[in-house]
Swiss-Prot record:
Belongs to the thioester dehydratase family. FabZ subfamily. HAMAP family: FabZ (MF_00406). GO terms for molecular function: (3R)-hydroxyacyl-[acyl-carrier-protein] dehydratase activity. InterPro entries: FabA_FabZ, FabZ, HotDog_dom_sf. The lineage of its organism: Bacteria, Pseudomonadati, Pseudomonadota, Betaproteobacteria, Burkholderiales. The active site is at H52. This is 3-hydroxyacyl-[acyl-carrier-protein] dehydratase FabZ.
Length: 149
């Protein structure tokens, strides 16, 4: 599935997240276990804008990191983009997180994630999110896969 678009219906089959915590609307590009580019349409209807901040709503940095982590989770799937029964992807670490641009309601947040390595059950990714081609956030992320109990 090289450079393939994947819509929300397929994302819902792959990720266990649901509203209000599903933060990937579309996969724009995908090379299995190599790289992924995803999209989040940031709307004023997101529940976190009620308190962050009512007079000047901005997307919380931790939510941008979560959107990157969900994108990274999608990247761990093979070329068939099938979820293994009972598999859950856990965010286990973050290094070098930097926030460089404020993300506002109405923005389109593009997440770009590449696999750095996979060793002893731990995936390591290089990730960055952009708005209008300007980097809003960058980080190295780590995740692992476990069977649901």
């Amino acid at each position: 599935m090289s450079a393939a678009e994947i819509d929300i219906r397929k994302i819902l089959k792959l990720l266990p997240h649901r509203y209000p915590f599903l933060l990937v609307d579309r996969v724009l590009e995908f090379e299995a276990q190599k790289r992924i580019k995803t999209l989040k349409n940031v709307t004023i209807n997101e529940p976190y804008f009620q308190g962050h901040f009512p007079e000047q709503p901005v997307m919380p940095g931790v939510m941008i990191l979560e959107a990157l982590a969900q994108s990274a989770g999608l990247l761990t799937f093979g070329a068939d983009m099938e979820r293994k029964e009972g598999a859950l992807y856990y965010f286990v670490g973050i290094d070098g997180a930097r926030f460089k641009q404020v993300v506002y309601p109405g923005d389109q947040l593009h997440m770009n994630v590449t696999v750095e390595r996979y060793i002893r059950g731990i995936w390591k990714f290089k990730a960055f999110a952009t708005v209008d081609d300007k980097v809003a956030c960058e980080a190295e992320l780590m995740c692992t896969v476990k069977q649901a109990e």
